[in-house]
Amino acid sequence: GLAKYIHSMYNRNMKFSWNPKKAVENLKKHKVSFEEAVTVFYDPLAKTALDPDHSKDEDRFILIGHSSKSHLLFVVHVYREDSETIRIISARKATKSEKKDFEEL
């Protein structure tokens, strides 16, 4: 299953950033734009978890929730130093097992 979830509320004043090259690669590989991924942060039922397996130099987090296009997305992100900016690392559609875990929480 997915890591234990952290309950967190995102707010409307969030700022987002990402590497433009990575955004293009992500869209080609996963067919999910970072612009769509941003909309998951406004899903009140989205769940956030620490991603300890991929957090060597900084704390990475996983967000799973529904986008404005009703896709269940798995979004990897970090908080920048100012803690108001969220940097998107990757975004993809959730797998069947992730969807099942999400629905059980």
Map each language-model feature to its residues.
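Ribonuclease/tRNase effector modules and their secretory precursors
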Residues: 1-105
